[in-house]
UniProtKB/Swiss-Prot annotation:
CDD domains: MobA. GO terms for biological process: bis(molybdopterin guanine dinucleotide)molybdenum biosynthetic process. Its cofactor is Mg(2+). The gene is mobA. Belongs to the MobA family. HAMAP family: MobA. It comes from Shewanella baltica (strain OS185). This is Molybdenum cofactor guanylyltransferase.
């Protein structure tokens, strides 16, 4: 029996390094950043949720359910993940940021295979050098653990998953897969990469 997998795209942050611009809606080569992300993951999952804490109406125009953090105060990616885990009945939830337009087109199958091979609770992607703490495939049943962690004042995703049986899946074969946009300069470089 195949596993049902939903996804959440995290677009709930403050984007301080982008001058406060909503990163998911910043245009890259004529399309909103989040549209590139959607195009990459849509064939790999059943449902997509968009986690946004502002500009919800604009995000809804992409045709997917928009959810805002249950925990108020822009508490970071964990808050968005907790909210999404409470909104899905899938076996696994894929978590990705809104500003990674070159995500692997084989992200889900490889991460799922890694989980099953190790009988792990979650998989975290790596670029071959660094783990990508907001590119995860996890079981929604981990929600209570994550909620308790956040409510204890913790914010770091990697500190949370270190407490669980996790596996790292390397995408070193796709070196630009997790290049993201935090500054206008990075956006310019990425635009050139996409047009190659």
């Amino acid at each position: 029996m195949s596993s049902q997998i939903d996804a959440v795209i995290l677009a709930g942050g403050m984007a301080r390094r982008m001058g406060g611009d909503d990163k998911g809606l910043v245009e890259l080569n004529g399309e909103a950043m989040i549209k590139h992300t959607i195009d990459r993951i849509k064939p790999q999952v059943k449902e997509i949720l968009i986690n946004a804490n502002r500009n919800q109406t604009r995000y809804a125009e992409f045709g997917f359910k928009v959810i805002s953090d249950e925990h108020t105060g822009f508490l970071g990616p964990l808050a968005g993940m907790i909210t999404a885990m409470g909104q899905t009945d899938a076996d696994y939830l894929l978590v990705v940021p809104c500003d990674c337009p070159l995500l692997p087109t084989d992200l889900v199958p490889r991460m799922l295979a890694a989980i099953k091979a190790e009988n792990a609770e979650l998989a975290v992607a790596s670029d071959g050098e660094y783990e990508q703490p907001v590119v995860l495939l996890l079981k929604p049943s981990l929600r209570d653990s994550m909620k308790a962690f956040l409510e204890a004042g913790e914010r770091k995703v990697d500190f949370w998953y270190a407490k669980h049986h996790f596996v790292v899946e390397s995408f070193a074969d796709q070196p630009n897969a997790f290049v993201n946009v935090n500054t206008p300069e990075q956006k310019q470089r990425l635009a050139m990469e996409i047009t190659k």
